[in-house]
């Protein structure tokens, strides 16, 4: 689970 700099959540 990661959260990138542009506030896009990747699950």
From Swiss-Prot:
Residues in the signal sequence: none
Catalytic activity: Endonucleolytic cleavage of DNA to give specific double-stranded fragments with terminal 5'-phosphates
Leading EC class: hydrolase
Disulfide bonds: none
GO biological process entries: DNA restriction-modification system
GO-annotated molecular function: type II site-specific deoxyribonuclease activity
EC number(s) reported in the record: 3.1.21.4
Transmembrane segments: none
Entry superkingdom: Bacteria
Protein name: Type II restriction enzyme PvuI
């Amino acid at each position: 689970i990661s959260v990138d700099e542009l506030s896009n959540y990747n699950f």
